[in-house]
């Protein structure tokens, strides 16, 4: 997730590095790049086909008189496969403050009318963790999505403790695993055991080449939502580390 960063020249340089990397092994690993919307089309055209691309946001419904918004069908039209929805910055930045309901509406439209995969972000603020509300907050955010959709086959959940995003603070592998395990249990109890088993749950929050291996070894962590570290060629070290962890588990 490149967020609101990078110039056209920066992206060209980064894409060149990604294109020079060994094959992704897409049968076992997916790598999804989410550039700023203005660069989504050109990034999709420039990247190798074994990289997927994603928008960072989309509107709640079909396009129309919604200045500045992005119809999920437009994302699909330029060849992108995914959209990130509910990122903590969309939920909590004062000028945005997207509600659980709004995010769920966006997800439902993207899934049902644009056939995009949705990376649905959940996570707690520091004060919510300190008051013991982590699981309750995540379950509330999951319930909003469950109320809006019935087919979870194209949903990936990303748990991102807000206090760890861009701060250099990382949830310990044990802290992250505890939440991931609770998310999977919630899915089993409130959606279905099949959805719980098949849904990938990513961890996001200051993921780096230095800490990704210990996180990836946790049984319920199925990958990462990477921010700052994805804007450097060394992002490929995270990909390689995750692939190596998968190979060790076989």
UniProtKB/Swiss-Prot annotation:
Pathway assigned to this chain's UniProt record: Carbohydrate biosynthesis; gluconeogenesis; Carbohydrate degradation; glycolysis; D-glyceraldehyde 3-phosphate from glycerone phosphate: step 1/1
Isomerase in keyword set: yes
BP-aspect Gene Ontology terms: gluconeogenesis; glyceraldehyde-3-phosphate biosynthetic process; glycerol catabolic process; glycolytic process
Class of this enzyme: isomerase
UniProt KW keywords: Cytoplasm, Gluconeogenesis, Glycolysis, Isomerase
Reactions catalysed according to its record: D-glyceraldehyde 3-phosphate = dihydroxyacetone phosphate
Subcellular localization: Cytoplasm
Coarse class of the protein's main subcellular location: cytoplasm
PROSITE patterns assigned: TIM_1, TIM_2
Catalytic-site annotation from UniProt: 87 (electrophile), 160 (proton acceptor)
Superkingdom classification of source: Eukaryota
EC number: 5.3.1.1
GO CC terms in record: cytosol
Chain residues that bind substrate: 1, 3
Keyword Transcription regulation part of the UniProt annotation: no
Molecular function in Gene Ontology: triose-phosphate isomerase activity
Quaternary assembly: Homodimer.
Family: Belongs to the triosephosphate isomerase family.
Remaining remarks: In plants, there are two types of TPIS, cytosolic and plastid.
Name of the protein described by the UniProt record: Triosephosphate isomerase, cytosolic
Lineage: Eukaryota, Rhodophyta, Florideophyceae, Rhodymeniophycidae, Gracilariales
Gene: TPI1
